Amino acid sequence: MLIRYKKAFEKIAMGLLSFMPNEKDLKKLQQTMKQYETEEDRQLFLWKEEEDIIGLIGVLVVNEYEVEIHHISVNPSHRHQGIGKSMVKALRDIYPDKELIPNENTAAFIEKCEICHGSE
């Protein structure tokens, strides 16, 4: 289940974000978290299964037509189970009238799954 990020989940979110290759540096990671917390056009969602938060997806609402996926990360012990794909599908439900587009950091995953444009 995709839930909105809350400050109470900051450490978990930072841990998941740190799995992204461009978020290894602590200062960069803190800057990214601050952007999600303060900029209205950026949204961070967490994937929760039972009581565990095991995934994260972060977006930038570009305009009324597009949402750009900036971050997508799954706890390594839960990978290869379709969680990333499920997060993108749930995101499509949150933004049904917008096209989901990847950025340079998420393009390879999104293209591999072929899920942004509605193909299953």
From Swiss-Prot:
The UniProt entry, under PROSITE patterns, shows:
GNAT
* The UniProt record lists the keyword Nucleotide-binding: no
Keyword Acyltransferase (UniProt) = yes
Q: Which UniProt keywords apply?
A: Acyltransferase, Transferase
State the Gene Ontology terms under molecular function. Answer: acyltransferase activity, transferring groups other than amino-acyl groups
Cross-referenced InterPro entries, in alphabetical order?
Acyl_CoA_acyltransferase, GNAT_dom
| Domain N-acetyltransferase intervals | 3-120
Coiled-coil stretches = none
Q: What Enzyme Commission number(s) does the record list for this chain?
A: 2.3.1.-
Disulfide topology = none
Protein name (record):
Uncharacterized N-acetyltransferase in lysA 3'region
